[in-house]
């Protein structure tokens, strides 16, 4: 699959559907309320993310593809917050604002990576006339390569048949992630992407792959579809088209943390690839890879071109080994989204010895990922003298990359890694030796971000200087 690319230079996509604002409150739970038998959450931070059709648009924007988003919001603070989130990602928002309805908002309260409660703020848009949306659609659809109708059953797509006709008249493919059991309303769509539960709720229970194919082809004929992509969780995906063999794709997921927004990712990548002129098979392959990435994240999230490219070429989603600073920032961001604890240390590591190995193993045990920042040759020379380093940077990094305890390696050219640590902001900063925590470069930055700093002991008698001395003594 190496010929596949995660770059989509010719794609432009239009999204129309139920837009939402997802809010997350994070905090610690250490006691039960005296007022009722419920935990008390001391909220320490909060996040806002785009949900529903807005998350679809975010997924497309994360692939560096121009995207326009149509939808209904309230004329309120939540609507302004959602618009702000989207515009930061260069998404063109073209909303119809209603004073009669609030922006759909879902507030989730989490503690220790567990969701305790969800609060929904919404009123259905079923009684809202679609004239303004249809006018916007007629104008915008002429300039894109694909249209996504994102249906969450909130009423934005009340006039979905009219929307499908507008797109088909413009010869633009229409992709729909369906909601409910009334698939008749999606008649004439180019591609539907139901999950297995949604498919069986309409077609009936399937006992085998043959059942899925038979009932899926009947669904295509019944509703005048061009194709059907059924997402099947741990069994991957199945693409069905009339007069063509079924195209089965096994799952790409390694670990599943959260399926929130996975359907959004699938349809986003599908539409983007089709708008770029890819075949349906290639579009499905890329969507399947992207779904395997996004279920490894916490909450609604998007997949970047770097992640998709890595996964296509068999590299891990988070990446391992030697990285640039920007690659490391991205890997750390993804790991934190999965709730992983990031540990960071640094050093010259000129001649690797058992003391180094033991130290790095102990540091790795303190978290889920270990970053090792390594001084460049110029930096080592300034710190240790003109005769150092013995091994150049490439050699030192290559040896460290072979250790199972080390996840990520990055080089820095300054005398200390303070600036780098301030950019990465690990959860735990570790240093070996007899330092006081406040003396460690980067400690202030880590503490200011709510992280911790720890000092680990080195093994007695193990040092690079001792190794060099022994070698020189042998020569003498």
Swiss-Prot record:
<dbReference type="GO" id="GO:0033785">
    <property type="term" value="F:heptose 7-phosphate kinase activity"/>
</dbReference>
<dbReference type="GO" id="GO:0097171">
    <property type="term" value="P:ADP-L-glycero-beta-D-manno-heptose biosynthetic process"/>
</dbReference>
<dbReference type="InterPro" id="IPR023030">
    <property type="entry name" value="Bifunc_HldE"/>
</dbReference>
<keyword id="KW-0418">Kinase</keyword>
<comment type="function">
    <text>Catalyzes the ADP transfer from ATP to D-glycero-beta-D-manno-heptose 1-phosphate, yielding ADP-D-glycero-beta-D-manno-heptose.</text>
</comment>
<dbReference type="GO" id="GO:0005829">
    <property type="term" value="C:cytosol"/>
</dbReference>
<dbReference type="GO" id="GO:0016773">
    <property type="term" value="F:phosphotransferase activity, alcohol group as acceptor"/>
</dbReference>
<dbReference type="Pfam" id="PF01467">
    <property type="entry name" value="CTP_transf_like"/>
</dbReference>
<dbReference type="InterPro" id="IPR014729">
    <property type="entry name" value="Rossmann-like_a/b/a_fold"/>
</dbReference>
<comment type="similarity">
    <text>In the N-terminal section; belongs to the carbohydrate kinase PfkB family.</text>
</comment>
<dbReference type="InterPro" id="IPR011913">
    <property type="entry name" value="RfaE_dom_I"/>
</dbReference>
<comment type="similarity">
    <text>In the C-terminal section; belongs to the cytidylyltransferase family.</text>
</comment>
<keyword id="KW-0067">ATP-binding</keyword>
<feature type="active site">
    <location>
        <position position="264"/>
    </location>
</feature>
<comment type="pathway">
    <text>Nucleotide-sugar biosynthesis; ADP-L-glycero-beta-D-manno-heptose biosynthesis; ADP-L-glycero-beta-D-manno-heptose from D-glycero-beta-D-manno-heptose 7-phosphate: step 3/4.</text>
</comment>
<comment type="subunit">
    <text>Homodimer.</text>
</comment>
<feature type="region of interest" description="Cytidylyltransferase">
    <location>
        <begin position="344"/>
        <end position="476"/>
    </location>
</feature>
<dbReference type="GO" id="GO:0005524">
    <property type="term" value="F:ATP binding"/>
</dbReference>
<dbReference type="InterPro" id="IPR011611">
    <property type="entry name" value="PfkB_dom"/>
</dbReference>
<dbReference type="InterPro" id="IPR029056">
    <property type="entry name" value="Ribokinase-like"/>
</dbReference>
<keyword id="KW-0547">Nucleotide-binding</keyword>
<keyword id="KW-0511">Multifunctional enzyme</keyword>
<feature type="region of interest" description="Ribokinase">
    <location>
        <begin position="1"/>
        <end position="319"/>
    </location>
</feature>
<keyword id="KW-0808">Transferase</keyword>
<keyword id="KW-0119">Carbohydrate metabolism</keyword>
<comment type="pathway">
    <text>Nucleotide-sugar biosynthesis; ADP-L-glycero-beta-D-manno-heptose biosynthesis; ADP-L-glycero-beta-D-manno-heptose from D-glycero-beta-D-manno-heptose 7-phosphate: step 1/4.</text>
</comment>
<dbReference type="InterPro" id="IPR011914">
    <property type="entry name" value="RfaE_dom_II"/>
</dbReference>
<protein>
    <recommendedName>
        <fullName>Bifunctional protein HldE</fullName>
        <ecNumber>2.7.1.167</ecNumber>
        <ecNumber>2.7.7.70</ecNumber>
    </recommendedName>
</protein>
<feature type="binding site">
    <location>
        <begin position="195"/>
        <end position="198"/>
    </location>
    <ligand>
        <name>ATP</name>
    </ligand>
</feature>
<keyword id="KW-0548">Nucleotidyltransferase</keyword>
<dbReference type="GO" id="GO:0033786">
    <property type="term" value="F:heptose-1-phosphate adenylyltransferase activity"/>
</dbReference>
<dbReference type="Pfam" id="PF00294">
    <property type="entry name" value="PfkB"/>
</dbReference>
<dbReference type="InterPro" id="IPR004821">
    <property type="entry name" value="Cyt_trans-like"/>
</dbReference>
